[in-house]
Amino acid sequence: GAQWINTLRDYAFPKIGRMPVDSIGQPEVLMCLSPIWTEKHETARRLAQRIKIMLDVAKSKGFRSGENPITAIHDAQVLPKVKAKPKHHKAMQWQEVPAFYTDLKTRDAMAAKALMFTCLTGSRTGEVLGMQWDEVNFAARLWTCPADRMKGGEAHRVPLTDEMLAIIEPLRAMKSKYVFEGQKRNKPMSNMAMLMLLRRMQVEGVTVHGFRSTFRDWASEVANAPREVAEMSLAHKVGSDVERAYARSDLLEMRRVLMERWSGFVAGSVGKVISIEKRV
């Protein structure tokens, strides 16, 4: 399926995609696995399995001979042992999000509105809770989160969809400094407000931050979005410093198409949304 090929596309093809299949050995496979073996171990493990299958098929068709380098790497224990890390930000499966969002829409609490917006934008909790009206350009359908609230230290532009605007536009009437005002006038909500709402909804184990992972999985598995577009949607830095210096675009319009489709999926209006395959 799409997820199978996407793993190879993102982590193997850039390094070994143009090589003759009979010239791929341990050093070439390690070039793909080593950079992500510790930080993204589960992804690296799946990548190794898929490279192994690919090379086994090539051997069965007579395109290569000898031992599979994945088997040799495993037997020689070339790569370090990785302790299973606890999942700090447990994520909801993307298939479960529309039903969860429908439930969320029935709730009037400000925390529910903030959580809906967080889920749709894939933003970090602090970015949403600190959101102020002067950061929003309704005419351009754009929210610019300033650098001082961004983990990466750079301002981030977020395209606003109809569903996102439907959440925040009614809140303008409150005339607060903050879009999602807390219990005190002109003060933001507590950073625990959305998490406590999840607990009241009896959504066990899921964290607010986890919705970023949910979006990322959906973007790869369902939308088949280019890696750069999906990563930039989460305000992740893509490429080396030199590559970023040359690629000055933040891919806003491509991200807008992706976020429109995500909003349509989450809010149950998929049929109205333009297919990203045609645009991205």
Which residues make up each language-model segment?
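N-terminal DNA-binding module of tyrosine recombinases/phage integrases
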Residues: 1-20, 68, 249-253, 257-279
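Active-site/catalytic core of tyrosine-dependent DNA strand-transfer enzymes
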Residues: 40, 91-98, 140, 149, ...
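Short, basic/aromatic-rich helical patch in the C-terminal catalytic core of site-specific tyrosine
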Residues: 29, 51, 122, 128, ...
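Catalytic-site neighborhood detector that most strongly recognizes the C-terminal catalytic loop/helix
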Residues: 6, 83, 144-153, 165, ...
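Basic/aromatic-enriched alpha-helical hairpins
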Residues: 1-38, 54-57, 247
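Basic, Lys/Arg- and aromatic-enriched nucleic-acid-binding interface segment
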Residues: 36-52, 60-131, 139, 150-154, ...
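Short, polar N-cap/turn motifs at the start of nucleic acid-interacting alpha helices
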Residues: 67, 135-142, 205, 224-245, ...
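Hydrophobic (often cysteine-bearing) scaffold residues that line and stabilize catalytic clefts
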Residues: 4, 25, 43-50, 93, ...
